[in-house]
Amino acid sequence: MTFRNCVAVDLGASSGRVMLARYERECRSLTLREIHRFNNGLHSQNGYVTWNVDSLESAIRLGLNKVCEEGIRIDSIGIDTWGVDFVLLDQQGQRVGLPVAYRDSRSNGLMAQAQQQLGKRDIYQRSGIQFLPFNTLYQLRALTEQQPELIPHIAHALLMPDYFSYRLTGKMNWEYTNATTTQLVNINSDDWDESLLAWSGANKAWFGRPTHPGNVIGHWICPQGNEIPVVAVASHDTASAVIASPLNGSRAAYLSSGTWSLMGFESQTPFTNDTALAANITNEGGAEGRYRVLKNIMGLWLLQRVLQERQINDLPALIAATQALPACRFIINPNDDRFINPEAMCSEIQAACREMAQPLPESDAELARCIFDSLALLYADVLHELAQLRGEDFSQLHIVGGGCQNTLLNQLCADACGIRVIAGPVEASTLGNIGIQLMTLDELNNVDDFRQVVSTTANLTTFTPNPDSEIAHYVAQLHSTRQTKELCA
């Protein structure tokens, strides 16, 4: 038997994990084992909301060392993280300034300024990326305007996964799928857009040309002295999750469900027409030259904050209590900027309900019901937008990532969207990370080949839409009375 041992480092906004994958060539079987799981979160530092990258690096190294201590020969390592955030380095490779998180308020108002000065349509035609107030384009403008004293010291700007790969290998890389999330990559050249960089105030010399997934960045020297290749995987976690989505045919859509929900479809060509711009659709880079045509939805961040504020530890019990409540009594727009990082999420949700003359969700279960119903309705809205954009309805929706374990939300999504939902795999980002490593090691031919492996090894659950459910009736009523595109606009 021929085995490959690949390690995926998968960092999310709320947690990280080091996972060991064992691939058996002859039977094309893939098994995952969690080596080390650790928390991640936002920190307040010198007036900024930041990431503790030193703690994350220590956790990554701890996980890798654990694998080596077991006597396992690692064939390769790959790192994926969330998008848009970056670390600045000087000529010696030392950090400059703080690793500020995208939920910091420093870029407030700069998106509107960019649209006014450059033109919204021109920015979109250049980048193909949706307008979000925390995109790297606006973060860099905030940095160069608010901290000009740092600029003479900056030699390099590395996005998060590239930074951690650099810390392991000493080699710098700018991976394409994650680079596209910055709104700074030209959609036609796949290189940094000089006009957008100039507006941001960043120096083009801070960046190297983006590289597509599958190259070896460098090597990590394990404690035993072995040189282990570190592969540039599809380092944006959603790009990795999509690779592991067992999409079957062109009529399949995906929803990567976690702190963020990202709904979209794969395409060989980007969509940058007026319809896409009006819907704020993004065309992020994917593997093998594919585009991830999608839309960001605030996701389970709202629930995570409610769990934290209410000190709720038993999520299954909360979901059970939520399921017993009537649907659609409390509806908010999860994509409202007010929910990006409010001081108190529960109060913010209640305020939004009050402003729309709705009952107030008071109990833990009512708050959760508000979030689940609102997300499902927004999923239905976005899926409809995507279908209109491509000119063809979808036949099924694949929900992947940690959020796909929420069976109530899965069923609400199926009912609201009126579409068959297939949930799984849970560790989609990890699996997609591993998939690119196996392709780089010449164990698999391409993404479609890897998806066949996922389909036969992952636990998948199907949810059939119930047209008689409360939320399905609510959607039908909405469609008959509302013509606006955005939910609760």
Curated annotation (Swiss-Prot):
Pathway where this protein functions: Carbohydrate degradation; L-rhamnose degradation; glycerone phosphate from L-rhamnose: step 2/3
Broad EC category: transferase
Active-site residue list: 237
Cofactor(s) the protein needs: Mg(2+)
Keywords linked to the UniProt accession: ATP-binding, Disulfide bond, Kinase, Magnesium, Nucleotide-binding, Rhamnose metabolism, Transferase
List of residues binding ATP: 13-17, 259, 304, 402
The keyword Cytoplasm is assigned to this record: no
GO molecular function: ATP binding; glycerol kinase activity; rhamnulokinase activity
Enzyme Commission number(s) of this protein: 2.7.1.5
Residue sites binding substrate per the record: 83, 236-238, 296
Keyword Magnesium listed: yes
Cellular component terms per the entry's GO annotation: cytosol
Reaction catalysed by this enzyme: L-rhamnulose + ATP = L-rhamnulose 1-phosphate + ADP + H(+)
Listed GO biological process terms: glycerol metabolic process; rhamnose catabolic process
Disulfide cross-links: 68-222, 353-370, 413-417
NCBIfam families (UniProt xref): PRK10640.1 (NF007925), rhamnulo_kin (TIGR02627)
Purpose of the protein: Involved in the catabolism of L-rhamnose (6-deoxy-L-mannose). Catalyzes the transfer of the gamma-phosphate group from ATP to the 1-hydroxyl group of L-rhamnulose to yield L-rhamnulose 1-phosphate.
Family in the record: Belongs to the rhamnulokinase family.
Protein name (Swiss-Prot/TrEMBL): Rhamnulokinase
Species for this entry: Shigella sonnei (strain Ss046)
